[in-house]
Regions:
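N-terminal beta-loop-helix "entrance" segment that forms/cooperates
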Residues: 28-56
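Short, well-ordered alpha-helix to beta-strand connector turns
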Residues: 56, 75-76
C-alpha cells in the first residue's frame, strides 16, 4: 500500500514529529511505501505535491489542528484520527488504514 501520512499540531514539533516517526515505522515495518508531511504553526514549507498525494492508496491524517490544502486529497480514501489518539494507538491506526485500503482495493476489483 502507498500511504501518505499527514500530521498537524499547533506547534508542529513534538507531537507531530513523534507521531509521524512512529506511524512511518509501523507502516514500513509492515511493508508499506510511506511519504510523510508535518504541518504546524506556520510550517507549510514541506508540503507534499498533489501528484504524490494522488498516487497514494490511502491518506492518513493525525491532527490536532486543521490540515492545510486538503484539496490535494480529493477522491482519495482518507483516515482521520486525533493526534493524541494516534500516538497512543499506532498499530490500530495503521490497521485502520489497511482496512480502508482493503475496502477500496476490493471495490476497484469488483467495478
Amino acid at each position: 500500500m502507498k500511504l501518505v501520512i499527514i500530521t498537524s499540531c499547533v506547534a508542529g514539533v513534538a507531537h507531530s514529529d513523534m507521531c509521524a516517526a512512529a506511524l512511518k515505522k509501523e507502516a514500513t515495518d509492515r511493508g508499506h511505501s510511506v511519504r510523510v508531511e508535518m504541518q504546524g504553526g506556520s510550517n507549510l514549507s514541506d508540503m507534499l505535491p498533489k501528484e504524490i498525494c494522488q498516487s497514494a492508496d490511502v491518506i492518513l491524517i493525525a491532527y490536532a489542528i486543521a490540515v492545510a490544502r486538503k484539496e490535494r486529497f480529493e477522491g482519495k480514501p482518507v483516515v482521520k484520527v486525533p493526534i493524541d489518539q494516534a500516538i497512543r494507538h499506532i498499530k490500530q491506526v495503521i490497521d485502520k488504514a489497511e482496512e480502508v485500503y482493503g475496502q477500496t482495493a476490493g471495490s476497484e476489483r469488483k467495478g
